Amino acid sequence: MRTKLVLLMIVALFLAACSAPTPEPAAPQEESKAAVTEAPAEAQKTEEPTEAEKVAESAEAASRPFVFTVRQEPVTMDPHVNDLSYSQYGQRLVYEALIEYTVSPDGKVGLGPRLAESWDVSDDAKTYVFNLRKDVKFSDGTPFNAEAVKWNLERLLALKLPPSARIPPVDSVDVVDDYSVKIVLKSPFAPFLASMTLPLMISPTAAQSHEEEGDMGQKWLTDNAVGTGPYMLESWVRGQELTATRNPDYWRGWEGNHVDKVVLQVVQEPTTQRLILEAGEADLADNIAFDDLDALSQAPGVVVEPGISLEMLNMCMKTVESPLADKRVRQAVSYAFDYDSFINGVLNSRAQQPLGPVPFGSWALDQDLQPYTRDLEKAKALMAEAGYPDGGFKVTIQTIAAYGWYQPREAQILQQNLGELGIEAVIDDKADAATFLGTIRDKEKGPEIYFWRSVAAIDDPDYELRRMYHSDFVGERGVNGSWFQDPKADELLDKALTIPSREERKSLYDEYQVILKDEAPCIWAAQMNYYITSRDVLKGYVWNPFNIGVPDYYQIWLSE
């Protein structure tokens, strides 16, 4: 029986028209306005086992863990400190949010309840009341209630680290009663409900009891975790594997098919990752190299399924304290890059070139934007205009190959293209995310060019645009490692957040994309397809384009 996957097709990849303006949903299970539509009928067919088969299969599967090979381990288990996708692979075993993206049987994505049963929104879209579940406890026995939510949100905002970028300016978080919490915003924030799928709830008791020198438990929570989720952190051997075991008191219970343990196995070498999956030593593999997909699809017991994504591959350029501070030089580099060699050669044509900073599939995409294409003569003319007719300077290209198998070859293409402009480029690969992030946040010593994989975790363009390009998110708070700061661009982003109508917001985002294309803070190199690679014994895994690749572990079970 094939893995139970829901193949999500994104309408905007095929239609130029954008979604009709619709206000943010104010009740559970309302369909998302993402450009996501019903999967083809054949992709939805699944073979349902009989009850007897389920019991037998579940008992057999309980004898071994679900093994998921990942290219990188979490930076930290503290979701208020770092919530990039690799961190969330571990964090979402243990932690949950108030709201979640759900996938319906017909393949549509919507906002649904998790720790909040329902919510109410004021007419001015500034006040939200979340009604919480009454049957939830953290795994250390601490009650999950309104006080716990208040503490979590206030901690998240007080830390002022990158995950706080997901939440708008909050005027107050108030406890209405034990199981109702009121959040008052300083101004309307169009994607607020979608953004509430991101803050994960930590046990206040665990964090407070391990606080050191006012760090709100950060140090302890780096390697420890106490949440309301289906699993508890059992062990973590850095650089090797993270193991989580069932939370026996999990509020959804353990009837039906589930796994007792989950192992995140760190495998950075692409060939090794493929061999482990082929041998049946792993059940799911993340980020398999495209070179291996054709062979894997023919391997016995292996399933390869496409999941169209909003994932973009960007090469961002430092806009301060280097020759790249001149936008004409950045434009020249954007024209010099060989997009076709990268997309068709390295990515095996399993990607397309974006028009700009917003991916295909987003309702905010400016379909009239003209992308940069390779034009070496134009690139050389811009270099001469900027005062660098022969190049004559040196840059560092910073990569993290463990995050993307394609990065070494992508860097070599860019290095060669820069050489054509007389720019000497040195490639510097970082071994882990913490080191990588530390360097791009250093204004003086950071690399001139770095690779960044952007992923839409919610159905709203502000999520990535703000943290990558807004002036407020340079340095420690964000990932604006290009140090791009433009008052007009900031103003457009800020204004778009306060408008409920998508049609009105889109006009602002169209203007914004024109500015970014002209300023060229990044080379928008490719929008990749995504492929789910698993063993055919894996059941219950549902593909979701938001929070790309992070499973709902509770739903997973194994048929052997």
Q: For each of these PLM feature ranges, what is it?
A:
Residues E117-P162, V176, K182-V184, I276-E278, ...:
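Aromatic- and charge-enriched surface segment that lines or borders ligand/interaction sites
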Residues N131, A165-H210, S235-V237:
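Surface-exposed binding/hinge segments that line
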Residues Q72-Q91, L115, T142, F192-I202, ...:
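A structural "hinge/loop" feature
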Residues K219, D249-A295, E424:
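Ligand-site clamp/hinge motif
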Residues R71, R166, M196, E255, ...:
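Local pocket/hinge segments that shape ligand/substrate recognition
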Residues T69-D123, E154, V226-G227:
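N-terminal lobe/hinge region of extracytoplasmic solute-binding protein
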Residues T102-D106, P199-W254, K261, E269, ...:
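Gly/Pro-rich hinge or "lid" segments in bacterial periplasmic/extracellular proteins
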Residues L13, V237-E241, R246, A336-Q367, ...:
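Detector for C-terminal structural segments
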